């Protein structure tokens, strides 16, 4: 984008547009079936260590470390096939693509996601989201730390961020202030955990599912005009 838009929509992916929790559950079941429950727990322990180390989910990196001691297991190579051929398009939340199309009809729309540089873009493409936003995709390690770069890529007077993590939305709001409208989607385990946390500032809008945005208008995402008190005659 060369000229500043009035508004740009920024959309998260995992548990916002697609059910990543279900993917994780099915991945765990697949590992358990192939290697046993103990090895499944080992995979998730490696995954957790990598997430703490890198700051993002790295399913492929966890699999790479997981292979230690299992090189002679025929099922190991099938796990890479499972990850790369996983049908993410089937994990889209109801009306997710319709919602993206609706938002694009209102204003420029881009995906702003966290993750590794290989599997996360693959997931976005496989789900059909890359084409849905016409390739307008950003994937960072910590997107809330990349707001300057995001604004340079998509200059706008105002932004609307749609995400399932209320604390992340609050952090972004503290940085951009009134130039950002935050939309909290109550989907997934981060959203559930957020119900018991103090969120400051709170989200501007809270919705139960991504499909609700299909009924919203442009003005719903723009800052309200200030109320000016008139002097009495």
Model-based region annotation:
Residues 1-45, 69:
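Active-site neighborhood of HAD-like aspartate-dependent phosphohydrolases
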């Amino acid at each position: 984008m060369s000229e500043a838009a009035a508004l740009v929509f920024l959309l998260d992916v995992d548990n916002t547009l697609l059910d990543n929790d279900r993917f994780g559950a099915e991945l765990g079941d697949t590992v358990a079936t192939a290697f046993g429950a103990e090895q499944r727990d080992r995979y998730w322990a490696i995954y957790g260590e990598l997430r703490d180390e890198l700051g993002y989910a790295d399913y492929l990196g966890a699999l790479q470390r997981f292979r230690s001691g299992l090189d002679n297991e025929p099922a190991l190579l099938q796990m890479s096939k499972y990850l790369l051929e996983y049908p993410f398009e089937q994990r889209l939340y109801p009306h997710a693509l319709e919602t993206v199309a609706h938002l694009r009809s209102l204003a420029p729309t881009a995906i702003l996601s966290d993750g590794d540089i290989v599997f996360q873009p693959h997931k976005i493409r496989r789900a059909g989201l890359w084409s849905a936003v016409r390739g307008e995709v950003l994937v960072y390690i910590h997107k809330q730390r990349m707001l300057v770069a995001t604004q340079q890529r998509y200059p706008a007077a105002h932004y609307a961020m749609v995400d399932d993590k209320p604390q992340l939305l609050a952090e972004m709001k503290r940085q951009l202030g009134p130039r950002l409208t935050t939309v909290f989607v109550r989907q997934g385990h981060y959203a559930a955990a957020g119900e018991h946390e103090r969120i400051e500032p709170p989200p501007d809008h809270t919705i139960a599912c991504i499909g609700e945005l299909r009924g919203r208008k442009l003005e719903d995402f723009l800052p309200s005009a200030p109320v000016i008190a008139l002097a009495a005659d």
